[in-house]
Amino acid sequence: MCRLSMPDAIVPFAKVSGLTSFAALAQVRRLLGVKKVGHTGTLDRFADGLLLLLVGGFTKLAPVMTRLEKSYEARIQFGVQTDTLDPEGAVVRCSLFPTFARVRAALPHFTGSIDQVPPEYSALKFGGVRASDRVRRGEAVCMKARRVFVFDLQVLGCEADLGEFKKTQAGRGAAIADLDLTRVRAVTLYVRCSAGFYVRALARDIAAACGSCAYVSHLRRTRIGPFDLAQAAGVSRLGSWTWGKERASCGAACFDVGAPPPPSSGGVATDSVSFGCEDLTVREIKQAVVSCDVDFANRIGLTACSVHAQYASRFLHGERIRACWFQSFGTRRPGERALVFSEGRCLGLIRKAANGFSYDAVFCTE
């Protein structure tokens, strides 16, 4: 009998800053003693936050899970641009800080459906080789614009130059009218976007629209589809965000600008130290496992269908799928995917074809 266990699991996992996504997978793989562990979207090494791990047979869900929308909190540092658009790159350009009014005016142009040119330092492949690897070898790459979607874009806070912003006005509750003509060193944004979106490219483009330049100094992924960072194994190991205290001594006034907090579990981490997951236990990971049930299917936008118990064995052995096997299927549009269940077990993923059904994946065997 097949049961959902660690060899077949979906695990929200909190990656720390300073650790690559691949290294995080390797540590979890060793900890669990399993060979197959994947994830649904790379996080840059400097970033922290939510990775959705797929363990064992559920790695076959990757094509579905990678399409889920994602949410981030990011600190955009103005006045400096690095070649990688993150803190790990070399400085290639400097400029004046933009006014807060120009930043606010630029944001509406980056919501909804937009064309975005990915950063040259990215995991996108050209001829089977990552663009970032080609650039580091001195090769030229031509990044083409891609259509992406931004569902929500909010300013959560900003850091103004005290030389232009009176100390008596600094702090929580400062009026936006007081800030508009003030030059800002950095802003913190909440972004909810489609798959394939690059926050580093957003920082580059917002700064350009403001007549400045920028890079992303801190980045945290707070949500993937219906999964929140607060549910993740190891979330307590992430650093807390203390940007106001840390930068008050650097000549910056730090304050909120009235935006309501987004539905996420924390702010941007300031630590870039890798804590690893050596002290993370199998028990913590198991406690974070997401049940693959009908509710899960609905939450990730899939149809759930139920197979009669007497046909489960035929399904698991890959026999041609027949409509009479199903107790229920819901709508049957061509191309629609569905998770298949029988007596509480998730058996696999199928797709409706014009002349029947086809297998996308079988997750377990008898």
UniProtKB/Swiss-Prot annotation:
The gene is truB. SUPFAM superfamilies: Pseudouridine synthase. NCBIfam families: TruB. The keyword Isomerase applies. The active site is at 44 (nucleophile). It catalyses: uridine(55) in tRNA = pseudouridine(55) in tRNA. It comes from Treponema pallidum (strain Nichols). This is tRNA pseudouridine synthase B. Keywords: Isomerase, tRNA processing. Its EC number is 5.4.99.25. Coiled coil: none annotated. Gene3D superfamilies: Pseudouridine synthase. Belongs to the pseudouridine synthase TruB family. Type 1 subfamily. It is an enzyme of class 5 (isomerase). GO terms for biological process: mRNA pseudouridine synthesis; tRNA pseudouridine synthesis. Responsible for synthesis of pseudouridine from uracil-55 in the psi GC loop of transfer RNAs.
